Regions:
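FAD-dinucleotide binding site
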Residues: 1-337
Length: 337
């Protein structure tokens, strides 16, 4: 039963042929994850992973790097990857109606002021004054939940200035790059696929950022196909524009499934979080040698400014981690007032 379910969930292709014996891929994958786990050092995976000349290395690099971390092997810390984060045993699955719909329904009775840009936070007095494009909000305390991409960009000015170490944490727990190119088909080109993950052999070797992506097919029976280029390659692809992202993703799928998928294509959509001014990246992780800044980032300032969001969460890289971290910080504030 496990083998059948496994084969339903994962597909591996070399060119246009599905591989039934995937040992070559998983050998490189298992050795890479084992090497990262074994080191327990605050170094980059590229310094420790073996089989870097193997023909499946770029695919493994894509899975463990840009797909899981939003970063290439040279840009994140093994210690951050290995840290014992509190990931729910139930797993994280796609919401068919969209996660935004879930959040909107869950908090529909919560008073929220949308489309209000914060430009400054003054914490020099006994409380805080939050400057927005719709006026100033005064409070005893506040929670900052924006991404480290926004924090490191300087869009929000803090007065007095934050400590040098706190400022540095915005840069050291840096944003990865992970973009989503989604296609909707009249019918799936892969039969019986549901919540299926597809990996393929990425041929171009000797690149610091693999030029490919992993694919999620038919999440929650939506008939969608989500291609997720990430890392520096994904960042540069986003800069090239929406058409470039669509063309690249569709051309890679055609190499696997052939030009016949064109006739079943209904819609396409591209999300480039790296170019979105509200995020300026996908999610955050520690750079090599910078794992200690995770804790620095979580610390409150003057018992008045609290920080939450996925970069501070122990359920890292997830929307539920961001939600839980915000709830936890709110509870701290309520108990302290």
């Amino acid at each position: 039963v496990y083998k059948e379910r496994y084969e339903e969930m994962y597909s591996v292709y070399s060119g246009n042929k599905r591989i039934s014996n995937e040992d070559a891929l998983w050998k490189v994958y298992d050795n890479a994850t084992a090497a990262i786990a074994k080191t327990r050092k605050d170094v980059a995976p590229i310094d420790v992973v073996p089989y870097q000349d193997d023909r499946w290395f770029n695919t493994v690099h894509t899975i463990i790097g840009p797909w899981e971390m939003g970063k290439d092997f040279s840009n994140y810390s093994c210690k951050d990857f290995n840290f014992d984060y509190e990931i729910p045993e139930s797993g994280v699955w796609h919401c068919k109606e969209g996660y935004g719909s879930l959040v909107a329904d869950m908090y529909k009775k919560t008073p929220v002021q949308l489309n209000t840009k914060v430009t400054a936070i003054d914490w020099g007095g006994s409380g805080v004054k939050v400057s927005t494009d719709k006026g100033i909000i005064s409070a005893k305390k506040c929670i900052v939940t924006v991404s480290n991409g926004v924090l490191s960009s300087g869009q929000i000015k803090f007065t007095p200035n934050l400590s040098a170490e706190k400022e540095e944490s915005f840069f050291k727990i840096s944003m990865g790059h992970y973009n989503r190119v989604t296609f909707k088909f009249k019918k799936l080109f892969k039969k019986k696929a549901k919540d299926n993950y597809l990996y393929y052999r990425i041929d171009k070797q000797n690149t610091s950022s693999p030029e490919g992506f992993c694919v999620t097919i038919n999440p929650s029976d939506t008939k969608l196909c989500m291609c997720d280029p990430g890392g520096e390659f994904g960042k540069n692809l986003a800069k090239a524009g929406i058409d470039a992202s669509l063309d690249f993703a569709l051309s890679e799928l055609k190499k696997i499934f052939g030009n016949k998928i064109n006739k079943d294509l209904k819609q396409s959509h591209v999300v480039n979080w790296s170019t979105n001014p509200l995020f300026l990246g996908a999610w955050a992780s520690a750079e090599p040698g910078a794992f200690k800044f995770r804790e620095v980032l979580r610390q409150s300032v003057g018992d008045r400014i609290y920080f939450a969001g996925e970069a501070t969460a122990k359920d890292w890289g997830t929307v539920n981690g961001a939600q839980v971290s915000g709830i936890n910080q709110a509870k701290k504030i309520v108990s302290s007032i």
